[in-house]
C-alpha cells in the first residue's frame, strides 16, 4: 500500500520570506521537521539572552508540531546543532522542561556557524500513535 504524503509548508520564521524548504513533511503518521532557530519575533534577530533563544527555539518546534496535531511527546528523534558545545548544560536545563518521560533519542552536535548567528538549530522526527 502506498503511503500518503501531506506536505505542510509554513512560511520561514522571522519574516525572512519564502525559503526553498517545507517546515515539515507529514508521511502517514511520521512528521519530519526542518531545522528551527530561536529568533525574536519582534526584532527578527537572535536574542542576546541564551535562555530566551532556547525557549524561542523550543516554542517554535512545539508550535510546528501543533499544526499537525502532535505534541513534544510525539518526538522520537531530535538533533541539536550548536557551534559552542560549552552551552550543552545550559541548553539541557531548558530543553528538559519541554518533555516528560520517555524522552526522544537525541544528538547534540558541535557545528560550524549557524544562519543568522544562531547559537542552536534543532530538527526532529515525530510519530503519532
Where are these regions (language model features)?
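N-terminal presequence-like segments and the immediate start of the first folded domain
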Residues: 1-59, 63-76, 82-129
